[in-house]
Amino acid sequence: MTDRVSAGNLRVARVLYDFVNNEALPGTDINPNSFWSGVAKVVADLTPQNQSLLNSRDELQAQIDKWHRHRVIEPFDVDAYRQFLIDIGYLLPEPDDFTISTSGVDDEITMTAGPQLVVPVLNARFALNAANARWGSLYDALYGTDTIPETEGAEKGSEYNKIRGDKVIAYARKFMDQAVPLASDSWTNATGVSIFDGQLQIAIGTNSTGLASPEKFVGYNRQLRSSNWSVLLANHGLHIEVLIDPESPIGKTDPVGIKDVILESAITTIMDFEDSVTAVDADDKVRGYRNWLGLNKGDLTEEVNKDGKTFTRVLNADRSYTTPDGGELTLPGRSLLFVRNVGHLTTSDAILVDGGDGQEKEVFEGIIDAVFTGLAAIHGLKTGEANGPLTNSRTGSIYIVKPKMHGPAEVAFTCELFSRVEDVLGLPQGTLKVGIMDEERRTTLNLKACIKAAADRVVFINTGFLDRTGDEIHTSMEAGPMIRKGAMKNSTWIKAYEDANVDIGLAAGFKGKAQIGKGMWAMTELMADMVEQKIGQPKAGATTAWVPSPTAATLHAMHYHQVDVAAVQQELTGQRRATVDQLLTIPLAKKLAWAPEEIREEVDNDCQSILGYVVRWVDQGIGCSKVPDIHNVALMEDRATLRISSQLLANWLRHGVITSEDVRASLERMAPLVDQQNAEDPAYRPMAPNFDDSIAFLAAQELILSGAQQPNGYTEPILHRRRREFKAQNR
């Protein structure tokens, strides 16, 4: 039984109440009684609106389901379909042209194109690593990944391999020729670096040259009479620090003495309370809020064991340099932090209220998140004894990503919520900025109206093709069987979706004012493929794109040196490449599209993916991790990938492509494989052979068999209930 404290008409879990009063409020000048009174008023006023929006989702889905059921044997008529969506208020009139007016936004969002990390906030070590990933070693990123092939004697091995190291150095030199080329010759032939009369000089044997663009030399860091120093370069708004130490093990092998090339990497990071975490009760929520508070205060620490040694990981300080003219330059040492709240659907037992029928009910989790992540973020706006030594925003803003919104009314509700939270926290109106995830079909189709609803708060739009695919399937669940999961990336609607997001953002004035983002690279070990393919995102006009790790951030950062995103956006501005009809193209399969073995392959792939993710979610409370697929390729899985897999199988089940017996048989085939893949984890609980005794196995099965009935295909209701069930059985 959760211990609770009464705060007005709120019944607050004591763990949350004590955290707020003893840790979060001190240093904010907010009176505790006034705070809790304000929270109660926000909950009372906005809960009915939140519920009404969810009711609208269900009503629209029911009408769409009915429309498809009545036309299932007819050829698809896009004109009739479009008019139907207009008639029911799903597809809204596009507003007149406008320009966003958000103010007080940090340069990392408005001026700098670069990678964006997403990390589960409940894991302090991951959170610290991500916040510190503003700067990363290119040498380490190349040496430790498959970006450099393990051929021709270049294996990683257990000790330093000079052959591999030389390939790393050669790769880095080639990159520098692209980002900061010399006026003549190549960095590959450089034999020395010096500064003369405020200019960078690069020796090439007995000759010397400078940079092709001398203004790209912006600073250096050197102690008197020391051979250990660094040169700071800049390109497309991103910095490159060349570390020179001829006495270091790597520097000794280099003609210039370069021991590393440090890239400005994760410019921004999203600390996630949503798809990558398991937060099903008050204890979980407070653990996340406490980490978020520590990040904003700058005092979050974590004991780390590595190579038999223990050390304390802390947040990095800012970095100082001398400018070419002898002045001072300070650059941020940490990524600028966003926080992702949950969407409008879920509720939390962290706070209960009277439901009006004598029964207590949980408060909407999105309301709670806005209040408490906003409160903690106040400490990131100032320094002091009660606020910690570091700040996050330098412009007085708090950045909140809001996911899974369906249409402009839901965006407007978020803005009203943020305004009310600002009043409770005593913050100026407009302090809480919003990042809009374009990951639900109704938002995609009405994106311009969604942006207009937040025109004075919006700081980013981002395509999340994983969730967006899940909603694409669920919205048209009754239309017929969908194409296979792997074929979705080549479907008509996806290209239109990605193009429309950029075009509409640019038309609304995002260039130089807000981020336009693109989705995650999920194959965490396949960095060579990422380096080859992910450059397509900045080439498409995105100022940021998601990466799964600090290493991936450093490698992806190279793309923003190779592509001038500002120039790309300038070229794209004024275009409208996607049509509504393309966005309305449902990814339906043709009749008799697959052989039996292809169907079995898809079902086994999806069942294995679902089990591999859900077993860690339910049994261990891990919301985001590398999950080996059926071919043992590590994939970064979160609830978005789970939504796709479960919805596709639910769709095939609904239309008779497979049966419930097929699903059960596949789950039973795949569970032993997942058990084997997790055999080295001492905390792992096998699902086989007693499948019905495994809550995780039953959760995976339920996600598929009940997938068509889940609200918008979301997995949270089943996952949360099953995780709570597991925790109750294992107290």
UniProtKB/Swiss-Prot annotation:
This protein's pathway: Carbohydrate metabolism; glyoxylate cycle; (S)-malate from isocitrate: step 2/2
Annotated Gene3D superfamilies: Malate synthase, domain 3, Malate synthase, domain III
Cofactor: Mg(2+)
EC number(s) given by UniProt: 2.3.3.9
Gene Ontology biological process: glyoxylate catabolic process; glyoxylate cycle; tricarboxylic acid cycle
A Gene Ontology term for the protein's cellular component: cytosol
Cellular location(s): Cytoplasm
Protein name: Malate synthase G
Origin species: Mycobacterium leprae (strain TN)
